[in-house]
């Protein structure tokens, strides 16, 4: 029997101090809808994926450990971070720490190989998103160019 092949991520779980505070914080930065919510968890919908916010962060802030959150407008996030008084971390990427120490890198959809299926983008109201030529070239080199 062969090994299973990893094909993607279903969700990311972030530990936060308080669910309502976390929803308010992330709501200042991003437009989103919830899949569900309880006293100890909330689920931010990303189409065919989600972010699970879980109450109970106890560890220190992340240093190098992070995840890249893909957005439709990276500059809008940069402006929202500034307006919210959130410090962008030094370096060439758009990284920040949330109030609970979760490190998040903001990545623009157009410039990376990550691709949502057209029907998922339509369902999210983002059918207008397209890839930059370099991202299409990188996908084509792997035999994955969009139609």
Predicted regions and their residues:
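Short, flexible segments with low predicted structural confidence
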Residues: 15, 52-53, 67, 129
């Amino acid at each position: 029997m062969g090994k299973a092949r990893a094909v993607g991520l279903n969700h990311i779980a972030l530990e936060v101090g308080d669910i309502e505070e976390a929803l308010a914080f992330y709501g200042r930065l991003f437009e989103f809808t919830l899949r569900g919510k309880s006293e100890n968890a909330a689920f931010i919908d990303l189409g065919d994926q989600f972010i699970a916010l879980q109450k109970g962060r106890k560890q220190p802030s992340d240093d190098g450990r992070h995840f890249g959150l893909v957005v439709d407008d990276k500059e809008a996030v940069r402006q929202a971070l500034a307006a919210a008084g959130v410090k962008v971390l030094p370096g060439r990427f758009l990284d920040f720490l949330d109030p609970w120490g979760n490190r998040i890198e903001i990545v623009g959809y157009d410039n990376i190989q990550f691709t949502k299926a057209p029907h998922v983008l339509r369902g999210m109201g983002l059918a207008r998103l397209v890839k930059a030529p370099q991202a299409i070239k990188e996908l084509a080199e792997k035999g994955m160019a969009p139609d």
